[in-house]
Structure formats: structure tokens, C-alpha cells
UniProtKB/Swiss-Prot annotation:
Subunit structure: Heterooctamer of 4 heterodimers ((alpha:beta)4); each heterodimer is composed of an alpha subunit and a beta subunit processed from the same precursor.
Protein activity control: Inhibited by AEBSF (4-(2-aminoethyl)benzenesulfonyl fluoride, Pefabloc SC), ampicillin and AMP(hyd) (ampillicin-derived penicilloic acid).
UniProt name for this protein: Beta-peptidyl aminopeptidase BapA
Main location: periplasm
Length: 402
């Protein structure tokens, strides 16, 4: 075990949270898609993040340790967990929710409850496939002492979603610990959200480039009323040959930056074939007072935002969307609080919200590409971040007046 591994596995939650906070701050320093000249439609919130929806908090734990050949149980590890508290970490209440399955080859726990009663209680966790069980149990453990004992049953079905980080990470080695999960749960906060190689997105690959966590938001208007729609994605999907940014076939125009193993560009019978697999998670938050079936409609529109960037939801790419409303609160042990109801036939409002989901999903996916940096992981596999200089040059040539 390396010194780095000992640090991660043996650290107290407070120390782990400090390390995670430092890493997250560093990842906020880089450019976002708009900084490279990528044009987007719609009006973002002040942060252009899911945390523009009041009350939403996000936390990450990032685990990076070891190099070279993979030895199961010893690494290298490139994994983590991302936590979203819909109403903040101190709230005991739930929220109305709806979800959509774009392609079902993956796992998102707690979704049968969402389908049946249109709500969930507690945080959302995004992580790597091999961590689902550990994260699920850790979230239950974290609730003990925070939720009254007579109401602990409300935390029996944690909401945990996964994408497969096996290219860069020892997925069977279980590099994530209970303390890591607690650190993300306790360290979640509002404000700017770290993107790229952080949290659950640490070991992910998107469109054959390095992928990870991305976020965006839109402020939409219907008459005199304004609502905010925020989106956070964990991207591990897509094929470079399909990638479009602002309608431009970026994946085909960018030169080089193909994945390598031991310094050699990947080759063999699968080289050049579509690689759209391994999954995509989309979390949608809004302050619009929506019913569960309306939130399901919102979740379905996320697929249109994904399609704008060229993904076809490959046969083995588990792609899911979950939408919730911070205005439709389910008090623990009480009656739901809903300040108003938006009629399903109110096309002006619903269409504005749908448009916000599509636009924010599209931008969140580009933001995660821009934020994700080149990474070398298990078995010396190296995946490149999308080259900023090439992307900026292409955008400037196509959109010179922006």
C-alpha cells in the first residue's frame, strides 16, 4: 500500500473533507465551455450550476491513488462519489420527483419508489459501478443520529446511481470507503460546483475524451413568473465520431488526443468502431412547483439535450435522468407542501421549463468535457482531456462574431 492509499483509507472524515475541499477548489480554477467561445442558447443563472436552484447543495469526494499495473484490491484507484442534497444536508424532508430511462443498461437505486409514489427522501449519490453497495449502506449509516429513530424507515431506500469507471480504476478493488462517503455528505454546500475529474466523475470517459462531472442552469420566464432549472451530469458515454458542440462535428475536427496504453495509441479490431457505452447520469433540479408526472416529463426532455451533443444512447450505455422540485416538499411525517400548481395545459410555462432542461443538459455535458483533464490510470491507460486550444480555435472560426 502506498502512502497515498494509506492517507485516503485511514483518514478521519474531517481530514478527508479537508483534502476533498482543496481538490474541489483547484478544479474550479479552469475555464468552462463559454470561456472557450462555445455559444449556447438561453439565460444561465448566476453560477450556471445546479446550485442556482436555492437550497441545493453538492459535495464531492475524489479518490486518486496508485499507478501502473492493476492489482485487484490494491489499485490504482480513480474513483469517488458526488452527493446532491435537494434541500440541503440539514433538511429531513423529501421532494417530489420523476424520472426517465433513456437506455436501461445500468442501475439507479430507489427509482421504483419514485415511479410508484413520485418522491424520495434524502440525498442523491453518483458514483462508480463497484461502489454502489458501499455508498448505499454508508448513506443509511449517515442518517443514524440525524433522522429521528422513529422515522429512520424513510432512509431505507437511498438513491444511488452508477457509471462504470473500469478503464482507469480498479473497479473490483473497492477503493471508496465509508469515510469518503461521509465526507461528501457532510462537505456538500451551495455555491460554485467543482467539475471534471471530481467525485463520481473521477474515472469517467465521455466521447472518447476524459469525462466527469458537469453542470449548468437556466432561468426561464413564463409571463411575470421566473423559474430556475439546474442540471448536473456524470458523463461516461458517447463516441468521439458522434460528438457535436454547438452543432459542429468537433470529434471529427480535433486532431490527436486519442486514448493510449503505455504510450501507444489504442489499436486492434475495435479501433475506430463506435464506443458509445458505459453510461450517463442526469440530475435535474427546479424551483418550479411541479407534480411528479410533470417532473417525469422534464426528465424525458433531458434526452433531447444529450442528442444535441451527438450521443445515440448506445446499446450498453445506461442513461438515466431524475428530476425533482424544491418547491414541492414532502415533510417527514407530514403533508406535502406545494405553494401552487402549474396546469399541464399551461403550455407557456411547461415549454419554458422543457427548453431550460434541454439547454442546461447540453451545456452541462460540454462543461464536463472542458473541465476534465488528461488522466493516466490503471494499467497505464491514458485518456486525454479535450484540447482547449483546438476547441477554442474551431469555435472562433465558426462563430467569429461572438
Amino acid at each position: 500500500m502506498t502512502s497515498t492509499q494509506r492517507l485516503w483509507s485511514g483518514a478521519l472524515p474531517l481530514l478527508t473533507a479537508l483534502i476533498v475541499s482543496i481538490a474541489a477548489t483547484a478544479s474550479l480554477a479552469g475555464p468552462r465551455a463559454r470561456d472557450l467561445g462555445v455559444p449556447f442558447e438561453g439565460t444561465p443563472g448566476a453560477l450556471n450550476a445546479i446550485t442556482d436552484v436555492a437550497g441545493v447543495e453538492v459535495g464531492h469526494t475524489t479518490v486518486i491513488s496508485g499507478d501502473g499495473a492493476m492489482v485487484i484490491g490494491k489499485g490504482p484507484y480513480r474513483t469517488g462519489v458526488t452527493i446532491i442534497h435537494p434541500l440541503g444536508k440539514t433538511s429531513l424532508d423529501g421532494v417530489a420527483a420523476g424520472r426517465a430511462v433513456i437506455n436501461g443498461t445500468g442501475e439507479w437505486t430507489g427509482m421504483h419508489l419514485v415511479d410508484e409514489v413520485g418522491q424520495f427522501l434524502g440525498p442523491i449519490a453518483l458514483t462508480g459501478t463497484g461502489n454502489v453497495g458501499l455508498v448505499h449502506q454508508s448513506m443509511m449509516d449517515w442518517s443514524v443520529g440525524k433522522v429521528p429513530e422513529e422515522a429512520l424507515f424513510s432512509r431505507l431506500l437511498p438513491v444511488v446511481a452508477e457509471t462504470l469507471d473500469n478503464r482507469l480504476n480498479d473497479v473490483f478493488g473497492h477503493g471508496l470507503t465509508r469515510d469518503h462517503v461521509f465526507a461528501a455528505l457532510d462537505g456538500a454546500k451551495g455555491g460554485p460546483v467543482a467539475e471534471g475529474n471530481v467525485g463520481g466523475g473521477t474515472g469517467m470517459i465521455a466521447y472518447t475524451f476524459k469525462g466527469g462531472i458537469g453542470t449548468s442552469s437556466r432561468v426561464v420566464s413564463a409571463g411575470d413568473t421566473r423559474y430556475t432549472v439546474g442540471v448536473l451530469v456524470q458523463a461516461n458515454h458517447g463516441d468521439r465520431n458522434d460528438l457535436r458542440i454547438a452543432g459542429v462535428q468537433i470529434g471529427k475536427e480535433i486532431k490527436g488526443a486519442w486514448p493510449e496504453v503505455n504510450g501507444i495509441v489504442a489499436a486492434g479490431p475495435d479501433a475506430g468502431k463506435p464506443q458509445d457505452k458505459n453510461s450517463l447520469l442526469i440530475v435535474i433540479a427546479t424551483d418550479a412547483p411541479l407534480m411528479p408526472h410533470q417532473l417525469e416529463r422534464m426528465a424525458r426532455r433531458a434526452a433531447l439535450g444529450v442528442g444535441r451533443n451527438g450521443s445515440t444512447a448506445g446499446a450498453l450505455s445506461g442513461e438515466f435522468a431524475l428530476a425533482f422540485s424544491t418547491s414541492h416538499v414532502i415533510p417527514l411525517g407530514g403533508k406535502p407542501r406545494l405553494p401552487a400548481i402549474i396546469n399541464d395545459t399551461d403550455s407557456e410555462t411547461m415549454n419554458a421549463l422543457f427548453r431550460g432542461v434541454v439547454q442546461a443538459t447540453e451545456e452541462a455535458l460540454v462543461n464536463q468535457l472542458v473541465a476534465s483533464e488528461t488522466m493516466t490510470g490503471a494499467n497505464n491507460a491514458k485518456v486525454y482531456g479535450i484540447p482547449h486550444d483546438q476547441l477554442a480555435r474551431i469555435m472562433k472560426a465558426r462563430f467569429p462574431r461572438r
